């Protein structure tokens, strides 16, 4: 969405915007590759705070900022999964993100499953059976 939102599909825009965005994406992927030389997984926040209350009224820029912790993983092409990791004092869930090496989705999913199980957060909707 960053590339499409910035670039117009013309030959001059292609060189200016698309190629530059592709270089930045490669730099981000390279940084993750270097990080994974030192570890198997990265665990980090899924967001800058708790989940939003239903009545939250944020500006478009504030909503965009909520993606801050997830954008790099998407650009790098590495698997990442977010899970509830606990509850904040205000009663809203906190999310944790597990990031794996490229094509090592299963390892990230396994750790994410353990984090969710041990967090004690069960946010599955209650099923109400009709008569």
What positions do the PLM features span?
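Short glycine-rich anion-binding loops that position phosphate/pyrophosphate groups of nucleotides
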Residues: 8-9, 47-50
């Amino acid at each position: 969405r960053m590339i499409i939102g910035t670039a117009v599909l013309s030959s001059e825009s292609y060189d200016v915007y698309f190629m530059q965005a592709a270089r930045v994406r490669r730099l981000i992927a390279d940084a993750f590759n270097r990080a994974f030389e030192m570890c198997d997984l990265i665990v980090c926040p899924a967001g800058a705070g708790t989940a939003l209350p239903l009545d939250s009224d944020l500006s478009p820029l504030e909503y965009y900022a909520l993606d801050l912790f997830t954008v790099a993983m998407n650009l790098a092409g590495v698997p990442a999964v977010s899970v509830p990791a606990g509850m904040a004092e205000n009663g809203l869930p906190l999310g944790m993100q597990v990031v794996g090496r490229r094509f090592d989705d299963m390892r990230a999913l396994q750790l994410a499953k353990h984090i969710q199980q041990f967090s004690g957060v069960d946010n599955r909707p209650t099923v109400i059976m009709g008569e």
